[in-house]
């Protein structure tokens, strides 16, 4: 913790370097990896390297070459990849962790097709991969394919109700609770919540955390302050207008950042000033969050760390307990939640048990 009471992340990320340099993460990656065939100007390269030096950025694994460069492979199986930025983030985490041991990552997208899953798992068994990560874009219960039992396997962002495999998911209830606590700590009492679609477990659990924080603070859970959205800007916009028509809240907690985008638009249409007259909190910490005006306070989904955890469990060689780890979701405090603070990441140091 710094002298001014703010808390900073322990490691500078490539995302922060890109923001500091005013370029994309892809550009930072190409510059740092020495891709001279890319048409990146000398000025852009200079800006990236300057940002790296000023922020003290060190790639994960820097100074720690692979223990033994080999040809081992971890198979990673997702139902979808292209529909979400979080899959690529988790894959990066797996690659970083696996490469420390000289192991590569092979990714397939199955579309949830059981026949395709079976074919891939048979191939990986023949290839004698180190293990398999079975993942889902949406946090949910799954019925893992039978052939997964041939492999050393873990589940990512999903869980097996029969507890046959170890799994890791975000601690969504605790994330929702912590976000609401930040709004309460900022002095807000009439705190509204815009949920996602009710069939999504993540949305339900974030709302449970919101309600838990209100009750713990002695505040009522008012049904009039809870409105269903759709995880899209359009849903956040429509839900915010409904909330304003029912009576002005002090703060609005949106169950994801995309709905917060629509919430911003609706508030500005009604003459409100985000972070001043009405506070807003998001969830996910998508790229757009830091570029909103004011920058959006939100909650980070730990997909990179989840990916690292999966690769580490596959490679550690010891038996993997068939339990579900709920990984902490840090609050990312910027300027929309009603406190005048510098951008800071507050890391919870525990995992959700409830």
What residues fall within each predicted segment?
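Extreme N-terminal segment that seeds HTH/winged-HTH DNA-binding domains in transcriptional regulators
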Residues: 1-21, 350, 354
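Flexible loop/hinge segments that line or gate small-molecule binding clefts
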Residues: 130-178, 219, 258, 284-296
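N-terminal helix-turn-helix/winged-helix DNA-binding helices
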Residues: 2-13, 52-86, 101, 124-126
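Flexible loop/turn connectors
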Residues: 241-354
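Central regulatory/effector-binding core of bacterial HTH transcription factors
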Residues: 96-140
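Hinge/beta->alpha junction and helix N-cap segments in small-molecule ligand-binding domains
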Residues: 79-89, 107-116, 138, 168-178, ...
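Short beta-strand segments enriched in small/hydrophobic residues
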Residues: 25-30, 66-81, 190-196
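Short acidic capping loops at alpha-helix termini that bridge into adjacent secondary structure
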Residues: 190, 221-225, 273-279
């Amino acid at each position: 913790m710094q002298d001014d009471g703010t808390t900073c992340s322990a490691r500078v990320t490539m995302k922060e370097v890109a923001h500091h340099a005013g370029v994309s993460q892809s550009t930072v990656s190409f510059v740092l990896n020495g891709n001279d065939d890319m048409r990146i100007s000398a000025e852009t390269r200079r800006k990236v390297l300057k940002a790296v030096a000023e922020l003290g950025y060190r790639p994960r694994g820097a100074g720690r070459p692979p223990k033994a460069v080999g040809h081992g492979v971890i198979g990673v199986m997702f139902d979808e990849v292209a529909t979400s930025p979080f899959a690529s983030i988790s894959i990066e985490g797996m690659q970083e962790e696996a490469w420390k041991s000289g192991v590569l990552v092979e990714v397939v997208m199955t579309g949830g097709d059981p026949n395709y899953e079976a074919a891939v798992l048979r191939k990986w068994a023949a290839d004698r991969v180190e293990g398999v990560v079975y993942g889902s874009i949406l946090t949910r219960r799954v019925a893992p394919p039978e052939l997964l039992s041939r492999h050393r396997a873990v589940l990512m962002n999903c869980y097996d109700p029969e507890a046959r495999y170890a799994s890791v998911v975000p601690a969504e209830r605790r994330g929702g609770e912590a976000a609401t606590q930040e709004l309460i700590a900022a002095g807000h009492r009439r705190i509204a919540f815009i949920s996602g679609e009710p069939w999504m477990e993540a949305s339900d659990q974030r709302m449970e955390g919101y309600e838990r924080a209100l009750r713990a603070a002695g505040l009522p859970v008012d049904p009039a302050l809870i409105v269903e959205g759709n995880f899209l800007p359009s849903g956040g916009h429509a839900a915010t207008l409904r909330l304003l028509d029912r009576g002005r809240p002090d703060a609005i907690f949106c169950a994801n950042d995309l709905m917060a985008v629509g919430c911003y638009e609706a508030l500005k249409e009604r003459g409100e000033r985000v972070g001043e007259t009405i506070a807003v909190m998001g969830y996910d910490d998508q790229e757009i969050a830091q570029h909103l005006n004011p920058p959006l306070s939100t909650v980070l989904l730990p997909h990179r760390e989840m990916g690292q955890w999966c690769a580490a469990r596959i490679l550690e060689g010891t038996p993997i307990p068939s339990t579900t780890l709920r990984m902490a979701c840090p609050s990312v405090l910027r300027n929309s939640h009603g406190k005048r603070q510098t951008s800071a990441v507050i890391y919870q140091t525990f995992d959700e048990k409830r």
